Amino acid sequence: MKHLVIRNLGPLKEADVELKRINVIIGSQSSGKSCLLKTACYCTWVEKRIELTQTEDFFARDGNFLKELERFHKLKGYIKEDTFISYESDFMSFSFDNATKSFTFDWMEERWNYRRSKVTYIPAERNLVAAIPNWFQVKFADDNIRDFMADWETARQATANDLSVLNLDVSYHYDANTKSDKVQVADGVTLDFTNTSSGLQSVIPLFVHLSHITKIKHDRIESFANIQENSVLLSKLDEEDKRDVYTNYVHTHHCDIFLEEPEANLFPPTQSNLVEWLLSLTKGEQPNNLFVATHSPYILNTFLEKLDDDINLFFTDNQEGQMLVKSATESNLQEIYDYGVDAFFNIETLG
């Protein structure tokens, strides 16, 4: 299990949470949901970088830990003089205290049992790939939107055959000849992606992307950077450990999925169907991890209907003008499930 602590980041005064395989955060707008989601994603990525390079030096230098978080996740103006972040897993622990500009790091006992993951952040702005037909010609900042677009480019080009999208009687494919995205709708008509409904423009990018990355998990990608990382890794291993550890590090074993507002522009039954599909990605021999930020009672209720021991629900709580992240108790979960939409109008009572 992972333990994440955040203090004084954006609207968040404090978050102290245990992360499970499935995590969901709810709360009002501008209450810090995305701050928690983005920081959890970032710390998961930092863990991966340190494991693959076997050094924390980059993040310990020149305030790089917070600089990279601010740049990639568009958090300019959110960092405060006393911002503090700490993360602990079975493999390592690290923290950064902006008040003292200090980065601390320790390896944990399970250091060599780490298994490489594909860390993916799916932003609320994912429909840009449909709304702007020539998005690949537009210069974007090097942030999570650009990163998702790069992943989308890989996924779309790999989807030459029709891919059915949920239960919508809709399919998507990429036409390599015209370098365009095509969507076949219920009446058999094929549309350019940019001419489809807002709901399809929101759900197709995340569906195609996740369908792609969760099916290629075991592929080994040998970029120049990866070759350098692998050489460093091998130099640190005992001969008898090399085979098992090397396989865990160079092959992607699962995905860490961080998803903003899956409900965007979707009819409630479709929202529920999407959650059921997302949950299917967390099953199997090598389950993927999922963290969702949502405003939707339909999204939340579908998660609660499938509730198991490996899901955590968090909610933002306004206490005297300061936003805290709380973990829902069993009674909180039952109350939300029993009252459905009404619970969202009284979310402050959960605290």
Region roles according to the model:
Residues 260-262:
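Walker B catalytic acidic pair
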Residues 264-266:
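ABC ATPase nucleotide-binding domain "signature" loop
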Residues 22-24, 119, 254-258, 289:
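Residue-level preference for the first positions of well-ordered beta-strands
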Residues 9-11, 24, 31, 126-129, ...:
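Short, solvent-exposed loop/turn segments at secondary-structure junctions
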Residues 40, 44-256, 319-338, 343-346, ...:
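Phosphate-coordinating catalytic segments in nucleotide- and nucleic-acid-processing enzymes
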Residues 1-42:
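Pre-Walker A-like glycine/lysine-rich segment at the N-terminus of P-loop NTPase domains
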Residues 14-20, 185-186, 248-253, 281-285:
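Phosphate-binding P-loop
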Residues 269-351:
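C-terminal lobe/lid and adjacent interdomain/linker elements of RecA-like ASCE P-loop ATPase modules
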